[in-house]
Amino acid sequence: MSEEKKQWSISDIEAIYQQPFNDLLYQAHAIHRTYHDPNSLQFATLLSIKTGACPEDCGYCSQSGHYKTHVEKEKLMSVEEVLQCAKEAKEGGAKRFCMGAAWRCPPDKAIPQLKEMIEGVKSLGLETCMTLGMLTKEQASHLKEAGLDYYNHNIDTSPSYYDKVVTTRKFSDRLDTLNNVRSAGINVCCGGILGLGETREDRIEFLLTLANMETPPESVPINRLIPVEGTPLAQAERVEGIELVRTIATARILMPKSAIRLTAGRTEMSDELQALCYFAGANSVFIGDKLLTEDNPQRFKDKTLFNKLGLTEMV
């Protein structure tokens, strides 16, 4: 008999999120130990396979065509180029290879090339993930046919705050794509960004949305905004570290089986803050020098920290 899924309320999550910090960490870490090896991390690598000139106006994004940033437009990479990057990622220790393209939605004519990329990366023994914008049911089915393991499509923030960050699409559009991905039988990677000007209440509503999905995301990336010059959020106030840890700990409690990925913003985090994030339940990171267009901690720096903490690669 299957276990009935709990439907969380705002008051439930407020009580978890806002409890004394030590109690929150204790509860999150106990759950983390129950469902995961607390001393192992999943390593993934993220590659931008088509960069810039995105028609969406996400206020945080360096790749939006609405803003003048440091990012230069680049066409879709060839299958050969992508596979070479995937080989290098595998040699660097990655187990999952994520491919991102700056589109509102992928053009149908690109689907055969994307399928070749998926098949080629899988042939190297890597898990595959893509983030290409919104997908139709048919497109999701094509990617599944090629063997795509995960599709990333973040909800970014709470439903209440969403239109303060993006105006070229609706929050419901995100949910529609997530439903198409799930219906195709592809695992879901879905999270958001802290530091968009949202309140704590927005973070709680964001977590509620994820946790109350019929099937919560298998992977939940938690990003700390990297402010980009030229975007509307270039001067956004950084979310303090304790708030980041509270968000990760609450996500771990609400979604105990999911991988919680500590993603963008690690370059600006101290070793101590990262250690707290891992203790709170984060058990996945991107390795490599770049996250799409922004810097990521260099491999040797990560290796040094993980050795200090006794964290090893997830088998």
Swiss-Prot record:
Q: Which residues bind [2Fe-2S] cluster?
A: 98, 129, 189, 261
Which Gene Ontology molecular-function terms are recorded? 2 iron, 2 sulfur cluster binding; 4 iron, 4 sulfur cluster binding; biotin synthase activity; iron ion binding
- Source superkingdom: Bacteria
Q: What is its EC number?
A: 2.8.1.6
Q: Identify the metabolic or biological route this protein is part of.
A: Cofactor biosynthesis; biotin biosynthesis; biotin from 7,8-diaminononanoate: step 2/2
Catalyzed reaction equations? (4R,5S)-dethiobiotin + (sulfur carrier)-SH + 2 reduced [2Fe-2S]-[ferredoxin] + 2 S-adenosyl-L-methionine = (sulfur carrier)-H + biotin + 2 5'-deoxyadenosine + 2 L-methionine + 2 oxidized [2Fe-2S]-[ferredoxin]
What family classification does the UniProt entry report for this protein?
Belongs to the radical SAM superfamily. Biotin synthase family.
Q: What is this protein called?
A: Biotin synthase
Organism source for this protein?
Legionella pneumophila (strain Lens)
Phylogenetic placement of the source organism: Bacteria, Pseudomonadati, Pseudomonadota, Gammaproteobacteria, Legionellales
